Structure formats: C-alpha cells, structure tokens
C-alpha cells in the first residue's frame, strides 16, 4: 500500500514540473553519454592499434640507415643477443616528391619523405584494408590509406614516378608509418618494379628486430650503438610507433574527456540547485508528513525514489546517445587502424562508465536530500524553512556560465596553438619560415647551400645544423651516445622550459625527456667527444622536443663541419619582406636540398589532428551554448519559483511585471558576465595547464597557449548571447505570477 502511494506521489511530482524533470534526465544523459563515449573511443583506438601492430608484426626496434651495410657484422651481433628472436633488413627507396603524382595531384608540396618498398619477409607487413597481405602484381602500387582522402585517390588511378606509371590497386595500413606524425610514407610495390625504379631515388635500409617477451629495448639500443653497427639515421622503438599512432586521435579523446568531466561538474551544480529548490517548494508537504508520524528516513526514500528512476532513465538515454555518436567519431580511426577486436571490452567500458556516473549522481543526490532532516514539522508549517540565498543562487549561475565558456575555450585555444608557427618550437624545430634538409653523406651540399644562402639577397637570416650520434660521458663516468645537433642555437631557438640555448663552444642543452632520464639539469657537466677530442660542456637549458622519441641534445658549434657519423644536415631560413617563398623553394630544391615551408610542414603533420580538434571545437560550442541556454533558463525559473510569494507581494503593491523583470535581470547580469570573464581567463590559464600535463609526457615541457584574440572574443560573444537569451526567456515567468497569490498562499 505504501509503495503504491509513493509511486503515485512520484508520478505526480514528475508531472508537476515537467521542465525540471526533463532537465534532470538531460543532465544525467549528457554526462553518461560523454564519459561513455570517451571510454568506448579510447578502447576502440587502443584495441585497433594493438590489433594492427600485432597483425603487421611491427618491429620492436628499427634502425634507419643510409650507406653500406656489413651483413656478417650484423649477424654476428644478433647471435650474441638472446633477446632477438628475428631480424631482417628492408629496403626503402626514398623518392623526390617533385617526381611523384597521384592521379592529377602532385606530391611536390608534401611534407613527408615518400618512397617505395616491398613486403617484409618475416614481419613488418603492410596490410590491405581487410588486414590481409595484398598480392602486388607488376605495374601495381598500393598507396598509404592516409593519402586516400588527402589526395582524393581512387583505385584504378595512375601514380607517376618520373616517367614511369603504376596503377593504384588499393590502399595499405602501415602500422609503422600510418600516422601523419611519422615523417615518412611507404608505397608498396613488387620486387620487379622496385628494381626497375631503383635509379630514380636514394636507397635507405630499415634494420629491424623483433624481441622475445620482456626484452629491454633501451638496453638493446645501447648495445647496438656500442657495437658501432650501421646507424646513419634515426632509431625507432615499438613504444614510439604506438605513441605516434595514438597521438592524433588520442588528442581528440583527451579533449572529449576534459569536456565530459566539466559537464559532470556543471550537472552536479545544477542538480544541487534543483534539489534544494524542490525541497524548499515542498517544505509544507514534508512538514505534514512529519506531523502525521512519517519517519525522516521514509521521507528521504520517497524523495530519492523520484530521482533514482530519473537517473536510470538518463543513463539509458546517455548510453543510447554514446552509441549513436561513436560511429561518426570513429570513421577516421577505423580507416587508419581498422576495427578493434575488443568490442566486448568497449561495451564493458561504456557500461562501467554509466555505472560510475550514475553512482556519483546517486551519492550526490543522497547527500543533498539529507537537508530534509533539518526541516521540522513546526518550521515547515510556519514557513520558516531556510532556503538558498539569492546571492548563492546567482553565484551558481556564474559558476555554470564560467565552466561553459571554459569548455568553449579549451579546443579553440588548442587549435590556435597547434596551427601557430610557434608550435614547431615544441617539436624540436626552429621557428623559421623555411627548413632545408640534406641527406646523409652530403657534406658538400651543406657547404654549397651555406655559401648560396650567405650571398642570397632574399635571405634575412639563416643557420646551418648537423645531427650526429655523439659519444658523451657524465660526471660519474657513465658513457652513452646522444642524438646531438650541432650549430648556432641562438638563431631560431626552441622553447626552453629551464635555462637558455647554448651560446658558447662549451655549452650544451638537453631535451626534457633526456634530462629527466639522466637526471641532468642546467649547471651540470657533460663530456662530449667531437672530432676525436673530449670537450667538457655545461648544460645551459632544457628544451621541448617531441621528435626522435623526445631524447636529443643541442651543442653550440659556430660552423658545423663534422664529417664522421653525421646522420642529417638541415638549414633554417627567414626570408626578407616581399621575397617569393615559392621561387626560393624551387631554386634550392634544384641545388639538391629538400626544401619545405615550415607552416606547410606543420599542416601536413598535424592536419588530421587539427581537423579533429576543429570538429570537436564546433561540437563543444554548440553543446556549451545549449548548456548555458538550458541551465540558466532552469536556474532563473527556479529562482522565480522560490521568490514567487515576494514577487506577488510586489505586484500587489503596484509594481508592474516589466519593472520586476528589469530589476531581476539587472541583478543577474553582473554575476553572469563575471562568469563569462572568469571562463575566458580560466580557458587561457587552467586550460593551458591541463593540455601541458598531456603534452609533457611526449616531451613538450613548458607548453604555452598561443591565443587567438578573435576566437576568444567570438566565444565570449557566443556565451553572452546564450546567457541573455536564457535570462530573457526564463524571467518571462514573472508575468504568470498573480498579485493575489500572496493573499491566498502559494499554489
């Protein structure tokens, strides 16, 4: 009998205020949907990447090398390494981008090192879109899947390499070079075509190793370097490959996670206000129930029953929304990495996320309903129940507005930062206009380029650098090899989180991850062996670098001229005002250098990531606008409901509805606009700290937002429009309050 009475009272409560009931369900649904979506996307991404890497048999350690290889030395080394279960040498023919055409699209402006390769014998397979090994026939080529949309490539289209023509037979997923953040891309051809095209490019070798379970790749890398085996190129490990694959879509998932947690916070603030308002509105009923002997526990259970069913309904709706949103947000991910085999794991994560969110809201509602214990029968019936003050209510509105604007700011600021030319300084790339790369062994090209640049009237500033694997020794005698770039680092400096760039011959700087690994910081000493001589250097600074595994060093050398163990040579250039960038690039490309516009390089590397962030940014603006509109309208309506008697008294005294509305709006606007300003400032400060934590793990220490003033102003205007519309709409409820209500009591 009691249960039936409770059920009828619960349904009556829902019908009494359908807007508040719907809003409560909406808050729960949004929280469950976003956190479940984050969990499912993360599960699908990691599952798909792991499945692709396992199917492709990605190497655990890869050494790129240009030059001769002594096979016997390699085999002798492998025999003495019990952790190696398999190894192979793959050939990669690096082609000039100017000689490549896909369909009618030239690859001249590509920022990638493009080349052709054949299928691996024992591992490192390039897979078709069905995750099977494609059969490549003579005259056919398989194109990296990331180029399908980028260059609008269709199966059956022609690919031209110089004067040779191949037919595009399909697309491949290359677990090793799939991400646009990898600087190279492999096209798959048959052995016969590879040999016939050999004279059109520069051949490099991929020396690859697979380890037994539990092997230490860092220990192997040190042993490989100490054995002085071929290492004229960067070394890459399996964790680095996985990180590059994860980073692009992982950035989007990180943004969704931050937004989800903030949406949960907004929902909890709103629910608190809704519950306290409801308790105040139904104080009379609570007093009557207590007066007739109903226990406080039963009254709490009665109230909680209403919200328990709403929580369950909201969770169900939220899971449904996450299922609908998951597919469109996974399209790019599935194209690059395939479908995750852990479908059940994704479902389990979604269910656990829903339980997690539901549990938090369940606990929160129970805590708020303890306020019912403070209501006595006497205070309720005499109308002396304490309610939220007007100031507290308006502070809640300010908080919600601040969080919503903060939500808008994070993806906008992240997008403007990643698309800014300054962001290259976190990647280990100098902040110039042009970057010129010279291949290994081309010291004469570097010298020639240096002479041309010094005499070029279009050049405002330039600097030459060369990178080599350099032996170093710490003060405690520990020896190792560092990937060290030599040159004048006072020109085109990177972002230094501690100290400054090396400016003298006895100074060196370390990347953040290398500094953390070795425990070396500014002021510490390091012995560097250059051209057969030991040089005792002082560490002057720690810089950001997310290239080459994030572990590099910078040595000051006025004029880099080392000839041994040089892995690559580069130059940074800033042009004079009015100089033709395209003309400059064409001139120096003809001199044997690979010349790229740094802005285009960033766009090519981070283009897919930027597109994902831009989509998320638009989605967040829409969601935040809706949150402000819904939440502020709800708050205003509840504030009016809690002040209904006072408003009625004012009307009875002769105040017009228009005057009361104006007064009400004026009292709300200062709090609301304060919330907008706080949200904008927090987006530039707290948002920066949140993104910095994520990028720090990749080697980007000292991350700072590059703010776009137009974007900030637009977000603030958008928030203001939503707030004004919400206050205007919500305050119209004052018109429905009659002057006589104060005489006959609240209806």
PLM features per residue range, with description:
Residues 62-64, 387-513, 522-524, 528, ...:
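Juxtamembrane segments of multi-pass membrane proteins
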Residues 2-268, 277, 421, 425-435, ...:
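Membrane transport/envelope proteins' first extracytoplasmic loop
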Residues 314, 318-334, 600, 607, ...:
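Juxtamembrane/transmembrane-helix interface segments of polytopic membrane transporters
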Residues 75-90, 293, 452-465, 594, ...:
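Short acidic amphipathic segments
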Residues 1-23, 280-298, 324-408, 412, ...:
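Feature of multi-pass inner-membrane transport and sensor proteins
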Residues 293, 299, 654, 659-660:
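Glycine/proline-centered hinge or cleavage motifs at structural transition points of membrane proteins
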Residues 16-45, 247-287, 307-322, 353-356, ...:
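Hydrophobic alpha-helical transmembrane segments of multi-pass inner-membrane transport and secretion
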């Amino acid at each position: 009998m009691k249960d039936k009475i409770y059920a009828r009272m619960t349904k009556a409560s829902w019908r009494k205020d359908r807007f508040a009931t719907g809003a409560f369900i909406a808050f729960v649904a949004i929280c469950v949907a976003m956190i479940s979506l984050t969990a499912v996307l993360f599960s699908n991404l990691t599952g798909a990447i792991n499945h692709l890497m396992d199917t492709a048999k990605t190497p655990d350690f890869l050494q790129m090398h240009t030059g001769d290889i002594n096979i016997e030395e390699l085999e002798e080394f492998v025999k003495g390494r019990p952790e190696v279960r398999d190894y192979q040498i793959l050939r990669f023919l690096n082609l000039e981008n100017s000689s490549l055409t896909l369909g009618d699209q030239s690859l001249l402006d590509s920022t990638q090192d493009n080349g052709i390769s054949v299928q691996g014998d024992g591992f490192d397979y390039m897979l078709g879109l069905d995750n099977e090994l494609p059969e490549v026939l003579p005259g056919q080529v398989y194109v990296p899947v990331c180029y399908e949309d980028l260059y609008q490539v269709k199966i059956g289209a022609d690919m031209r390499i110089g004067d040779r023509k191949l037919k595009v037979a399909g697309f491949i997923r290359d677990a090793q070079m799939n991400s646009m953040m990898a600087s190279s891309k492999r096209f798959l051809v048959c052995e016969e075509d590879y040999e016939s095209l050999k004279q059109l490019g520069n051949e490099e070798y991929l020396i690859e190793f697979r380890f037994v379970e539990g092997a230490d790749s860092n220990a192997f890398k040190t042993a490989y370097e100490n054995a002085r085996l071929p290492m004229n190129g960067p070394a890459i490990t399996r964790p680095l490959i996985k990180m590059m694959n994860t980073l692009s879509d992982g950035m989007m998932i990180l943004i969704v996670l931050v937004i989800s947690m903030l949406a949960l916070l907004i929902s909890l603030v709103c629910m608190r206000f809704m519950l306290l308002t409801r308790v105040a509105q139904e104080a009379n009923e609570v007093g009557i129930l207590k007066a007739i002997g109903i226990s406080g526990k039963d009254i709490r259970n009665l109230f909680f029953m209403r919200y328990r069913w709403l929580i369950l309904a909201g969770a169900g709706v939220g899971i449904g929304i996450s299922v609908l949103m998951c597919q469109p947000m996974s399209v790019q991910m599935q194209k690059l990495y395939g479908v995750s085999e852990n479908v059940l794991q994704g479902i389990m994560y979604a269910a656990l996320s829903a339980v997690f969110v539901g549990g938090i809201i369940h606990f929160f509602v129970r805590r708020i309903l303890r306020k019912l214990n403070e209501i006595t029968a006497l205070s309720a019936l005499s109308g002396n129940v304490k309610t939220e003050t007007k100031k507290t209510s308006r502070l809640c509105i300010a908080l919600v507005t601040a969080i919503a604007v903060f939500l808008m700011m994070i993806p906008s600021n992240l997008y403007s930062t990643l698309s800014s030319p300054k962001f290259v300084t976190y990647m280990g790339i100098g902040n110039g206009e042009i970057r010129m790369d010279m291949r290994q062994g081309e010291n004469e090209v570097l010298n020639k380029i240096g002479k041309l640049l010094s005499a070029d009237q279009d050049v405002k500033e330039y600097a030459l650098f060369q990178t080599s694997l350099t032996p170093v020794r710490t003060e405690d005698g520990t020896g190792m090899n560092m990937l060290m770039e030599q040159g004048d680092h006072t020109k085109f400096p990177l972002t230094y989180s501690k100290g400054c760039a090396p400016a003298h011959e006895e100074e060196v700087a370390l990347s953040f991850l290398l500094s953390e690994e070795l425990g070396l910081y500014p002021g510490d000493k390091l012995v560097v062996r250059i051209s057969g001589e030991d040089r005792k250097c002082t560490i002057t600074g720690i810089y950001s670098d997310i290239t080459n595994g994030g572990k590099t060093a910078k040595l000051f050398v006025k004029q880099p001229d080392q000839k041994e163990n040089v892995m690559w040579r580069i130059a940074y250039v800033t042009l004079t005002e009015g100089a033709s960038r395209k003309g400059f690039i064409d001139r120096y490309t003809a001199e044997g250098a690979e010349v790229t516009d740094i802005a285009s390089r960033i766009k090519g590397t981070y283009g897919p990531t930027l597109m994902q962030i831009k989509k998320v940014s638009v989605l967040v603006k829409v969601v935040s606008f809706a949150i402000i509109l819904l939440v502020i309208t709800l708050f205003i309506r509840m504030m009016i409901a809690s002040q209904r008697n006072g408003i009625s008294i004012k009307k009875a005294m002769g105040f017009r509805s228009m005057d009361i509305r104006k007064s009400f709006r004026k009292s709300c606007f200062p709090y609301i606009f304060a919330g907008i300003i706080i949200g904008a400032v927090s987006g530039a400060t707290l948002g920066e700290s949140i993104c910095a934590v994520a990028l720090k793990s990749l080697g980007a220490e000292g991350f700072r937002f590059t703010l776009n003033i137009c974007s900030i102003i637009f977000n603030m205007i958008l928030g203001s429009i939503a707030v004004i519309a919400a206050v205007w709409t919500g305050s119209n409820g004052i018109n429905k309050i009659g002057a006589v209500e104060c005489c006959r009591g609240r209806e």
